[in-house]
Amino acid sequence: MAMSSLWWTAILLLALTVSMCYGVPTYQDFLYKHMDFPKTSFPSNAAYCNVMMVRRGMTAHGRCKSFNTFVHTDPRNLNTLCINQPDQALRTTRRHFRITDCKLIRSHPTCRYSGNQFNRRVRVGCRGGLPVHLDGTSP
């Protein structure tokens, strides 16, 4: 009986490890990829995007992420959207927040981005009561 419990515990731990390593979004991933508060200062939006995309690992291993949005608000303003929400719920803010959209304009020899700032509503996907996915923005 004890051996059976140990076996199932090992299987469960393996499954959890695999799910964490292979694409299950986490709150920490969300913060790292999309949140920049207070906004890091650069002389232009393009300079901001070129540096931030590298800093946040979106240009690693010879690949350039084609598009990313950074949100410039306290993460708690987005966390409240996901309280008591089912996993994979999509929620949109009522308020507008300052964001920067970074769009790839050249990938060779190095990744280069244009940047545009907007005030937008933010739509997030929830898991475990926290935002884990930026699903988009709207005017």
UniProtKB/Swiss-Prot annotation:
Family: Belongs to the pancreatic ribonuclease family.
UniProt EC number: 3.1.27.-
Keyword field: Disulfide bond, Endonuclease, Hydrolase, Nuclease, Secreted, Signal
Pfam families (UniProt xref): RnaseA (PF00074)
Domain of life: Eukaryota
One annotated GO molecular function: nucleic acid binding
GO annotation, cellular component aspect: cytoplasm; extracellular region
Organism ancestry: Eukaryota, Metazoa, Chordata, Craniata, Vertebrata
Protein's name in the database: Ribonuclease homolog
Main localization category: secreted
Compartments, as annotated in UniProt: Secreted
SS bonds (residue pairs): 49-102, 64-111, 82-126
Organism: Gallus gallus
GO-annotated biological processes: angiogenesis; defense response to Gram-negative bacterium; defense response to Gram-positive bacterium
Classification via PROSITE patterns: RNASE_PANCREATIC (PS00127)
